[in-house]
Design a protein with these regions (language model features):
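C-terminal tails and terminal domains of large nucleic-acid-associated
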Residues: 496-532
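A glycine- and charged-residue-rich anion-binding loop/surface
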Residues: 12, 18-22, 27-30, 44-45, ...
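Conserved hydrophobic residues forming the short capping helix/wall of the S-adenosyl-L-methionine
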Residues: 87, 383, 515
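His/Asp/Glu-rich metal-coordinating catalytic cores
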Residues: 1-49, 54-268, 286-300, 319-323
Length: 532
């Protein structure tokens, strides 16, 4: 999410989520740092612009609108349809959705004039946005690439970018995801032969896993299914929802009697159906992960079946994806993925496309966006290679504050942009301390020590009972430390210590040192001292 503020008015562009990695145990979603938008700032927001319908750009919209549901939202027809489905799931009412098309202009408040530009991406109806203000003109590309043969025929509008460049662009905010990749991204049309070969070789069950928003990929699978006389069955709540929306709006063309419901699956032989599933990133609760773990109640995979992972591997998801691949392989399935076949192309511009964009726009200044630090740096180098002055290439991480004055951007500060963690029904209640506790529990184990003392007599009346979880060693290994705990407690009480909390710290310190020295572990320790 990016935030633009001028003369007491604010504009937001995109409002997405991230999915947790292994260092966020138990976390469901990571929201952008919405804490910056306190009630006073939230009242200044004149609009939220959504560039496209991927989760990392729209996923946090319901959480924002729970605080202020009447924020006007601008986006393409498909993007807003996907957002509306989310808002209904969250039971949010009173929202204001404004459908825009490429070439449209909109005045937002008194400070922002918007123009929308068609861009090509891995989801239909993506838009870039030009924002004109008294401080200067900027373009935010959103996610884009320059596929010259897109499946839907909708190319990135290079003439619009060139025209805006002629008018003068002060700040060009450009997708950096593939800035390290040389050349141009392959066209979506080039993967069709590989998908065809998968269908030709699959003589039993066939499962295709892809992003639930990848309408183009699902369209290719539908076309291939018709050609090979297979029905199509969507599996996964988000897949079913998104494809229904795409079909209703005309973005997905489904021949009659092609799609069947999950409950109808048993009525067909394995070689008469292709299952289109969520879970291409190994998400633990996704349909594909449950199939790989033999936990799906309706679908099983066995010897001779085929699974096609028609997606890229998002950094950070490697372990989860390979666990699913290994699980499917162990069950006897043949797994086809990007590592062994051309079954996916990226939706983000590679270095050659970025250079082309810089040369036709010729911006005064550039701010790389989207991606890790190395991607931002690579994109910055591309901008400088096309002649953008080095001092006008702005590199910032999340929370960076930029001032655009008379068309010149400068980094002037940083705000706290810490992620808000969603844990079940709790939003923002999970703290870093709790996450640390979870990591310790998962990596180092847990020890509880319960004992009773008589502080007046300075004696331990009940020997410490130690319970361990997450240790390879048997509980009997802790027998040698109990005598030391008793000694340390009685010495502390003889010295006048009679507070239960302080005595618990004695226990924690004593067993903690012993475990670190003897077992090379630093577990979570919960001591309980009962005074009698």
């Amino acid at each position: 999410m990016s935030c633009y503020e001028i003369n007491g008015e604010m504009l937001l562009i995109d409002c997405g989520v991230l999915f947790p990695e292994d260092d966020h145990p138990g976390v469901d979603l990571l929201l952008p740092g919405l804490d910056y938008l306190d009630d006073e700032k939230l009242a200044k927001v004149k609009a939220l612009v959504l560039t496209h319908g991927h989760e990392d750009h729209i996923g946090a919209v319901p959480y924002l609108l729970k605080r202020r549901p009447d924020i006007p939202i601008y986006g393409s027809k498909l993007t807003l349809a996907l957002v509306e489905a989310k808002l209904r799931e969250h039971r949010i009412r009173g929202y204001k959705l404004n459908v825009v098309h490429e070439g449209d202009v909109a005045e937002v408040g008194e400070q922002f004039d918007l123009e929308f530009i068609a861009v090509n991406h891995s989801i239909p109806d993506a838009l870039a946005v030009c924002v004109r203000t008294d401080a200067g003109t900027l373009i935010n590309t959103g996610d884009f690439k320059m596929d010259q043969l897109p499946l839907d025929g909708r190319i990135t509008d290079l003439r619009a970018f060139a025209r805006l460049g002629e008018e003068g662009v002060d700040l060009f905010m450009v997708d950096s995801t593939n800035a390290e990749v040389p050349g141009f991204v392959k066209s979506e049309t080039e993967i069709e032969p590989a998908i065809e070969r998968v269908f030709e070789k699959a003589n039993k069950k066939l499962i295709v896993a892809c992003f639930a928003s990848h309408v183009h990929r699902v369209q290719q699978v539908l076309n291939m299914a018709v050609r090979h006389n297979r029905k199509v069955c969507y599996v996964g709540r988000s897949m079913v929802r998104n494809m229904a929306v795409a079909q209703e709006l005309g973005y997905l063309h489904v021949p009659d009697n092609t799609v069947i419901e999950l409950r109808e699956l048993d009525h067909y032989r394995d070689n008469e159906v292709v299952i289109v599933s969520t879970g291409s990133q190994g998400e633990p609760l996704s349909a594909l992960a449950r199939i790989a773990n033999r936990e799906h109640r309706d679908i099983e995979v066995g010897e001779g079946d085929t699974v096609l992972l028609a997606s890229s591997l998002i950094p950070g998801n490697e372990n989860a994806v390979y666990r699913v691949i290994n699980g499917l392989t162990k069950l006897g399935a043949t797994v086809v993925h990007k590592g062994n076949a051309l079954v996916h192309v990226s939706g983000h511009a590679a270095a050659g496309e970025l250079l082309y964009a810089y040369n036709i726009v010729r911006p005064r200044a550039v701010m790389p966006i989207h991606g890790e630090v190395r991607h931002l740096v690579a994109n910055a180098d591309l901008a400088k290679a096309t002649g953008v002055d080095e001092k006008n290439v702005v590199l910032v991480e999340d929370g960076g504050v930029i001032d655009l004055v008379d068309g010149v951007p400068r980094v002037v500060g940083k705000i706290d942009a810490s992620y808000i963690l969603v844990d079940g029904s709790g939003v923002g209640e999970l703290t870093e301390d709790t996450l640390t506790d979870r990591r310790i529990l998962g990596e180092e184990g847990f020890l509880s020590v319960v004992t009773a003392v008589d502080t007046r007599s300075a004696i331990v009346v009940s020997r410490p009972a130690i319970q361990a979880r997450g240790f390879a060693e048997d509980d009997s290994v802790f027998a040698e430390i109990t005598d030391q705990i008793v000694t340390e407690l009685e010495n502390a009480m003889k010295g006048g210590m009679d507070d239960a909390h302080r005595l618990q710290q004695v226990v924690r310190r004593t067993i903690g040192r012993w475990v670190a020295r003897s077992l090379r572990r630093r577990p979570m320790i919960v001591p309980v001292v009962v005074k009698i």
